[in-house]
C-alpha cells in the first residue's frame, strides 16, 4: 500500500522512502545537482527542490517556489520543471524527447530510470536553471 511521505527536510524525505523509490529519487537528486549545481537544494511543499523563484499565489501573496522538484507518487516518480520561455513550459515542449514518460505542462512522470532519456532531461534541467517560472 502506498504511504505518502511526510517530512521536514530532504534528508528525512529520502529516509522515509521505500527502497525502490529511494534509489530512483536519490539518482535524480544527484543528477540534478550534477547538471545544475547553481540551483541551491531546498525543501518546499514536502518535496526536495532545487533553486527557487518568487511568484504571486492566488491570494496575491509572494511565495517561494522550487525551480525543480522531485516527488514519490503512488504509481510513479514526478520531476517538476517549473520553467518557461515564450512558448510555454519547458517540460511540455520537450515531451517527445524525454523517453517512455508521461509529461504534463511542468511535470515529468516515470516508473523507472531506464524510461527516461537522460540526455533530454539534462537539456531540460539546464534550460530550467536559466528560465525559472510559471505561466499564470
Where are these regions (language model features)?
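Charge-dense, helix-prone N-terminal extensions
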Residues: 1-136
Amino acid at each position: 500500500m502506498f504511504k505518502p511521505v511526510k517530512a521536514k527536510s530532504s534528508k528525512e524525505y529520502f529516509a522515509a522512502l521505500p527502497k525502490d523509490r529511494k534509489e530512483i529519487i536519490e539518482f535524480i537528486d544527484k543528477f540534478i545537482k550534477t547538471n545544475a549545481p547553481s540551483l541551491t537544494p531546498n525543501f518546499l511543499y514536502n518535496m526536495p527542490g532545487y533553486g527557487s523563484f518568487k511568484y504571486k499565489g492566488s491570494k496575491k501573496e509572494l511565495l517561494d517556489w522550487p525551480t525543480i522538484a522531485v516527488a514519490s507518487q503512488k504509481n510513479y516518480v514526478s520531476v517538476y520543471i517549473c520553467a518557461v520561455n515564450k512558448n510555454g513550459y519547458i517540460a511540455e515542449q520537450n515531451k517527445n524527447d524525454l523517453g517512455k514518460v508521461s509529461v504534463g505542462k511542468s511535470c515529468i512522470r516515470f516508473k523507472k530510470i531506464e524510461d527516461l532519456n537522460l540526455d533530454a532531461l539534462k537539456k531540460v534541467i539546464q534550460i530550467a536553471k536559466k528560465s525559472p517560472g510559471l505561466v499564470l
